[in-house]
Amino acid sequence: MAEESYDEECDYLFKAVLIGDSAVGKSNLLSRFSRDEFRLDSKPTIGVDFAYRNVRVGDKTIKAQIWDTAGQERFRAITSSYYRGALGALLIYDITRRITFKNIEKWLSELRGFSSPETVVVLVGNKSDLGQSREVEEEEGKTLAESEGLYFLETSALENQNVEEAFLSMIGRIHEVLTQKIVLDNRLNGDGNNESNGAVVPPGKEIVNIHEVTATRPLSTSLSNCCYK
């Protein structure tokens, strides 16, 4: 169950990005996840936008900083700074427009060119509420995800279907990857319970902090910060 928390202190920051063609629903997915809002008159993103949401992992509060960028070619100059430091990505297409699915290969190639090999990627087929206009079958999305080693699900920002699941599965997997890396690094360094790469591994504790993850406090913002337990 999610609950609102406007002033809760946060322990760590995870940056994630939304990627895909213009008008696939990136902004509405972000507003649905961060503020539980949906706008039928949503306008294309100009440049870059971002929002926060707090997620509880073990005994830590993680602030998920989700970045949304315009899908238009004229904004591609911001590419490198947009991807820098991203630990996760939602790769989004519109199930009613096949061209947006075909372009996933381009977006994935760009992501892999600018991000770490450990970046967690979730393939998202959005607008599942428009099944009568579907041009991309769900099985096609699953097949592509399996071939590329991605997670997959279909969402509807309008009906709030699988939106939580898409973001939280990404954040949860980021936590798993970082925890495994910390444990492995500590074993290689012979420091089972000592500090390594900016993290401490206490017995029985879940670890989320390495050099890519930054300790932070909530910023003063009008956006809702929700904790998921």
Swiss-Prot record:
GO CC annotations?
Answer: plasma membrane
Q: Which cysteines are joined by disulfide bonds?
A: none
Where does this protein reside within or beyond the cell? Answer: Cell membrane
Annotated membrane topology is:
Lipid-anchor
- PROSITE patterns xref list: RAB
Residues that coordinate or bind GTP: 20-27, 68-72, 126-129, 156-157
Q: What Pfam families does the record point to? A: Ras (PF00071)
* GO biological process, any: protein transport
Task: Say yes or no: keyword DNA repair present.
Answer: no
The entry's function note states: Intracellular vesicle trafficking and protein transport.
The protein depicted here goes by the name Ras-related protein RABA6b
Give the species: Arabidopsis thaliana
Annotated gene:
RABA6B
